[in-house]
């Protein structure tokens, strides 16, 4: 019958289809098993390649294989870092055995091998610097820094006087200076090496100066100088004597003879700082520099007069920057015997109407207390400062006035020649009568910029007597100390600084003994 099938035939067909399905399933299982069966452990493979290189020169081509693995840009490939670390060990071994050094009388075939190894070594450094250190993967950056510094150490072991310029170190410093400003690897370099070892500091100074002296375009120069500044500011300690130069990354003092000269050491730091400052800095960077100038920067300079232009430019910036600049100038005058005749003239010009209202008022008075501490200052000069502050206090906020009065008290104690400004009396009856009827012109010239020419010494402190009637009771009470006997040795200004108007009110009634 047409359309009907023999049972035997249909059974055979089903059997064949069943067998086909079985074979397909078996084949599929086989395919799934094959990767795991042939899978190679990356760590084991790299260890094998490394050990073969170290065992025999016949396997030097493994170096190229490891380089290709280290270059793999895949961030998920764990073999890249393993290969980079293995190569570091390989080249450390080759350096220690002088297998990358050409010698006189060496056979041409040997020279070819040495040259090939040098090229691979250079290629390896390029991978660490360009692909790892300047990349965006933090782990690779940190690994590259560690491996490059290991190479520096290994290279230094093979030479009596290690040439830092020809090794990876100068390229490493340049790469660190080219990183984005917020890159954490620069801080890691500073913490682990720059701040820890004298030889690293010394040669970083040289590398910074050399790099900044090259022809960099505008944006690159700004980036490099900003990173250089960040690096230099990380140094908080300045060696005071030869005995402070004790820590060496590359070995014994014998290998770092130039470092044993404190003069040479400081000279390199000075050159690095000058190269950085010449590139231009922002307002905030200038403030950062001035804030640590006396402790972290000026002590490096053998020729402190080279900082004068920087400080003068900083003074011209105005505001709190001017005050910080004068602080730096005062350090050079008092500690380094630098002559700066216009110092007090410049300081006097900062006493303007906004001073007692400014956010840096407390800092100003702290520094003023230092600047005016010498008892050898001319009475006419001291009188000008006292009188100008008295005039500014008339329009100042209570929180500012309560600093001015104790500061004046301390000035009178240090400079007794100015005290008659408080008790200037007219004894001639006729002159006294004229004053009472017509009043008098204050001889003090508020517009004069030279503190030696203001005639303040001929004036009196009527401003402070006026403040004794101030609306704020604490200000009025404090102002009265100028009219009383000076039995107190001095006031601690810190007790009156950093207070707002509300804080002055919270004091409650002020008792002045």
Annotated model-derived regions:
Residues 337-513:
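Eukaryotic scaffolding regions of large macromolecular assemblies
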Residues 3, 11-347, 371-373:
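Alpha-helical solenoid scaffolds in large eukaryotic transport, assembly, and signaling factors
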Residues 1-6, 513:
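Intrinsically disordered, low-complexity mixed-charge
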């Amino acid at each position: 019958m047409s359309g009907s099938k023999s049972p035997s035939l249909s059974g055979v067909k089903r059997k064949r289809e069943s067998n086909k399905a079985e074979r397909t399933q078996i084949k599929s299982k086989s395919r799934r098993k094959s990767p795991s069966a042939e899978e190679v452990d990356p760590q084991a493979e790299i260890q094998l390649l490394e050990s073969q290189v170290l065992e025999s020169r016949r396997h030097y081509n493994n170096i190229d294989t490891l380089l290709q693995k280290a270059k793999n840009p895949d961030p998920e490939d764990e073999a890249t870092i393993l290969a980079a670390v293995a190569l570091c060990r390989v080249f450390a071994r080759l350096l220690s055995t002088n297998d990358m050094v050409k010698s006189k009388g060496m056979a041409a075939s040997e020279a070819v091998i040495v040259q090939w190894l040098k090229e691979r070594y250079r290629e390896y450094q390029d991978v660490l610097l360009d692909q790892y250190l300047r990349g965006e993967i933090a782990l690779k950056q940190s690994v590259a820094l560690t491996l490059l510094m290991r190479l520096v150490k290994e290279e230094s072991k093979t030479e009596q006087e290690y040439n830092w310029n020809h090794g990876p170190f100068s390229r490493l410093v340049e790469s660190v200076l080219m990183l984005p400003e917020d890159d954490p690897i620069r801080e890691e370099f500073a913490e682990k090496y720059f701040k820890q070892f004298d030889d690293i500091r010394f040669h970083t100074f040289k590398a910074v100066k050399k790099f900044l002296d090259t022809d960099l375009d505008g944006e690159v120069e700004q980036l490099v100088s900003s990173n250089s500044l960040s690096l230099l500011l990380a140094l908080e300690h300045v060696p005071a004597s030869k005995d402070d130069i004790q820590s060496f990354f590359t070995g014994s003092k014998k290998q770092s003879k130039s470092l044993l000269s404190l003069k040479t050491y400081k000279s390199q730091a000075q050159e690095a700082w000058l190269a950085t400052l010449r590139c231009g800095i922002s307002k905030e960077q200038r403030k950062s520099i001035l804030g640590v100038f006396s402790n972290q920067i000026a002590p490096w300079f053998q020729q402190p007069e080279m900082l004068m232009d920087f400080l003068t430019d900083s003074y011209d910036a105005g505001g709190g920057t001017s005050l910080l600049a004068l602080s730096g100038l005062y350090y050079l005058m008092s500690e380094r015997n630098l002559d700066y005749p216009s110092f007090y003239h410049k300081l006097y010009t900062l006493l303007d109407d906004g001073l007692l209202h400014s956010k840096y008022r407390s800092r100003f008075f702290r520094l003023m207390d230092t600047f005016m501490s010498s008892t050898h200052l001319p009475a006419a000069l001291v009188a000008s400062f006292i009188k100008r502050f008295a005039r500014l206090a008339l329009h100042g906020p209570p929180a500012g006035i309560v600093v001015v009065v104790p500061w004046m008290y301390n000035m009178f104690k240090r400079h007794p020649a100015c005290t008659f400004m408080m008790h200037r009396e007219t004894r001639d009856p006729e002159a006294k009568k004229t004053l009472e009827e017509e009043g008098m012109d204050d001889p003090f010239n508020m517009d004069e910029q030279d503190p030696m020419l203001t005639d303040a010494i001929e004036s009196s402190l009527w401003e402070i007597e006026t403040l004794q009637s101030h609306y704020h009771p604490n200000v009025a009470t404090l102002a009265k100390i100028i009219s009383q006997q000076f039995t107190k040795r001095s006031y601690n200004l810190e007790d009156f600084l950093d207070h707002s108007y509300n804080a002055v009110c919270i004091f409650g009634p002020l008792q002045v003994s």
